[in-house]
């Protein structure tokens, strides 16, 4: 029994200079932990509600003092004296206290900060690393890092439509080797961009943000960088995309590469990319409400490539269940702040894995130095993690935590590699 003695919160800054919530939890046995909440740029319409102050005269309306007050004045007293190990009870207490479907009264950012800080405190009190506390003795698989090395869309002020172009070191034998491959290719890409007179400025997630002639041009750059770094595209390093189509969808049409197109056009476009490049995962290829489009996209490409639902599923077990029933997509992106509590996140992961959907743990574009998602990826055997380029300390912090976990596991550590992508043919 390690009862919660005190809960505190404050407003801190995320990696984009916007306020976010940090929560501290003190247990009666003296255990003290803190957790910080991330924030997205391209957000799904069905995500849990991020409570902002709306005061234009302070942080341009993006302050989170209301969420901080919710933690200190309401949530803290409601969970005081509860056992920190009773995560499900604590999360359910907060959800009931909020009383809304999307956590809009207290704010998902308030609930999540408490939920994560409590889990960390319970793990520390039990003298276990977080990945072991959450995942048990079978938590030993390190995820494939999906390194977002070219940023476009909402993550960069450029003319590139697709939001993320990723390197996936699937052929490595260990996580540390895979990360090294990705880092070396990242630096090769920087040299290439300089040589071609293109910008090496960074986007929100640490990737380069050059203006390019087309989305294909970005993929061509990645292929060239992989070769320049001494690796084999497809066999050692594969490619992935986060299209974030909802960002360029309006009034029933997609504005893509300067044209108004429909879902059938995009499906054919991505089918051509899959045939032309070692492209093994595509996230959010269509709008979050384009269910008919997803029916067609999945029928055409579902057997060939991982189709990841981010805005489509928003880490919500109910939306995921709808998708599973319809048979759309075959993977879920897992972002803890989309649903607002650790328990609901774990429920979404469990449902996905039971249903044969792969799982991808993910950061947000507005991040902090908090490394919880690294432990969570190992705890739930996600097999894949998205946490940006190997640049900017808020991104690298997660990779460094995974390196620590790999070392901690020693000979028991297993790298997911190709096995994380059951549709990958190479």
UniProtKB/Swiss-Prot annotation:
Active-site residue numbers: 205, 335
Q: Function, please? A: Catalyzes the reversible conversion of 2-phosphoglycerate (2-PG) into phosphoenolpyruvate (PEP). It is essential for the degradation of carbohydrates via glycolysis.
Residues noted as binding (2R)-2-phosphoglycerate in the record, renumbered to the chain: 163, 335, 364-365, 386
Record-linked PANTHER family: ENOLASE (PTHR11902:SF1)
Q: Which Pfam families match?
A: Enolase_C (PF00113), Enolase_N (PF03952)
Q: Which GO biological process entries does UniProt record here?
A: glycolytic process
**Residues of the signal sequence?**
none
Q: What class of enzyme is it?
A: lyase
Q: Would the keyword Transit peptide turn up in this protein's UniProt record?
A: no
Family label: Belongs to the enolase family.
Q: One GO term of the cellular component aspect?
A: phosphopyruvate hydratase complex
Q: What is its main location?
A: cytoplasm
Sample GO molecular function, one term: magnesium ion binding
Instruction: Return the EC number.
Output: 4.2.1.11
Which keywords does UniProt give here? Cytoplasm, Glycolysis, Lyase, Magnesium, Metal-binding, Secreted
Compartment annotation: Cytoplasm; Secreted; Cell surface
Coiled coil start-end: none
Q: What is this protein called?
A: Enolase
């Amino acid at each position: 029994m390690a009862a919660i003695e005190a809960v505190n919160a404050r407003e801190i800054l995320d990696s984009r200079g916007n306020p976010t919530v940090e929560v501290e939890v003190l247990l009666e046995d003296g255990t003290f932990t803190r957790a910080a909440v991330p924030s997205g740029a391209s957000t799904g319409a069905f995500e849990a509600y991020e409570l902002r102050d709306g005061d234009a005269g302070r942080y341009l309306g993006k302050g989170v003092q209301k969420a901080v007050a919710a933690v200190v004045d309401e949530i803290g007293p409601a969970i005081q004296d509860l056992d920190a190990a009773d995560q499900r009870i604590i999360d359910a207490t907060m959800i009931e206290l909020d009383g809304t479907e999307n956590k809009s009264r207290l704010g998902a950012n308030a609930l999540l900060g408490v939920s994560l800080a409590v889990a960390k405190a319970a793990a520390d009190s039990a003298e276990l690393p977080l990945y072991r506390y959450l995942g048990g003795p079978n938590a030993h698989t390190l995820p494939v890092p999906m390194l977002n090395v070219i940023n476009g869309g909402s993550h960069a002020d450029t003319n590139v439509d697709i939001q993320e172009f990723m390197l996936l070191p699937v052929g490595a034998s260990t996580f540390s080797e895979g990360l090294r491959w990705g880092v070396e290719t990242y630096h090769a890409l920087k040299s290439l961009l300089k040589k071609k007179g293109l910008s090496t400025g960074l986007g929100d997630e640490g990737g380069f943000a050059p203006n390019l002639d087309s989305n294909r041009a970005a993929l061509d750059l990645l292929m060239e960088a992989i070769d320049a770094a001494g690796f084999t595209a497809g066999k050692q390093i594969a490619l992935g995309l986060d299209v974030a189509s909802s960002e360029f969808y309006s009034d029933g049409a997609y504005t893509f590469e300067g044209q108004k197109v429909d879902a059938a056009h995009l499906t054919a476009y991505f089918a051509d990319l899959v045939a032309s490049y070692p492209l093994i995962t595509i996230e959010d290829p269509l709008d979050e409400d384009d269910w008919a489009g997803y029916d067609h996209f999945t029928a055409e490409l579902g057997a060939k490539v991982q189709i990841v639902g981010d805005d489509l599923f928003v880490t919500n077990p109910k939306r995921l269940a709808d998708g599973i029933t319809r048979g759309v997509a075959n993977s879920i992106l897992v972002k803890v702040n989309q649903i607002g509590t650790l328990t609901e996140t774990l429920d979404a992961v469990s449902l996905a894995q039971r249903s044969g959907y792969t799982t991808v743990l993910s950061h947000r574009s507005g991040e902090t130095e908090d490394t919880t998602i690294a432990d969570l990826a190992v705890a739930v055997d996600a097999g894949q993690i998205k946490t940006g380029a190997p640049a900017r300390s808020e991104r690298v912090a997660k990779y460094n935590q995974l390196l620590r976990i790999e070392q901690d596991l020693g000979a028991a550590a297993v790298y997911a590699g190709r096995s994380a992508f059951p549709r990958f043919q190479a």
